[in-house]
Amino acid sequence: DIRRVNVNIAATTVENYRKLKEAGIGTYILFQETYHKKAYEELHPTGPKHDYCYHTEAMDRAMEGGIDDVGIGVLFGLDKYRYEFAGLLMHAEHLEAVHGVGPHTISVPRLKKADDIDPTQFDNGIDDEIFSKIIACIRIAVPYTGMIISTRESEEVRKKALSMGISQISGASRTSVGGYTDEERPHDTEQFDVSDQRTLDEVVQWLMDLGYIPSFCTACYREGRTGDRFMALCKSGQIQNCCHPNALMTLAEYLTDYASPETRKSGEELIKEELTTIPNEKRMRIAGEHIESIYQSNKRDFYF
């Protein structure tokens, strides 16, 4: 049941971004790779990605084309991490200053082994301690953004990253072209080696064991809570009035449709406990009724 499609494609024109907006995409995501101009040009000596300015200004063109939810990121390890960190924050500051909307998400990938890449050939790799500090500092500096960490990181690293400020993680990812169409993971075309190879069910159970509420919510996009409206709700903290019950309702859907018996049992207990903590009594009652409908009547897609 796909309710939101985020798009990660190379930098393009305002006209093409407008087409994506008209098609109803969610967030447009593009990583800078490196903010260091000389390093960027050395890594992209030819081809359509060679133009540093065209790539760096992609989010400005995306917003000009009407896309107000954008996701940025930098590949830590290509250049000095302090420079990349500063560039990332300056990019976020620029988007908010010029367009009134900062990045909807910030991703923090770091250089990892891949089919034709040996990370030891690069001199600017960062260890787990520095990586955790970067995550914490981004969270402090850009408190409204969603922070993403992928399965290129291990379970141990992802656990610590969650406590440092990560709010979105992937599970059962496939990084090869057409990877989700195959029963077995095709390693020969993977973008990077997957370190956390647990199933989505295992990741969901793990998150609940750690005290988190796994959320599959897509409500903001469909309710028009994007761009500057989303920013205002996030900065004031009011977004939690929607996020909490929506997380519980979407978790109930996942548990009913996809979870193992063990995960479903744990999740239903968590939902029962969390429902009682919703401060607004009316919202608590409505959320509870919707969750019961999910369990008993096979109804879906409730959200505030």
Which positions does each model-derived feature cover?
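Glycine-rich tight-turn/loop motif centered on a GG-T
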Residues: D1, Y40-Y52, D118-D127, H187-D193
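Radical SAM/AdoMet-radical enzyme domain recognition
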Residues: D1-L75
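Residues that cap or flank secondary-structure elements
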Residues: N8-I9, H50, I126, I149-S150, ...
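Short Asp/Glu-rich motifs
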Residues: N16-Y17, A39-Y40, Y81-Y83, Y180-T181, ...
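Short low-complexity, flexible loop/linker segments enriched in glycine and/or proline
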Residues: K21-A23, L43-G47, E84-L88, E183-H187, ...
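Conserved C-terminal portion of the radical SAM core fold
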Residues: T27, Q32, C53-I117, D127-E156, ...
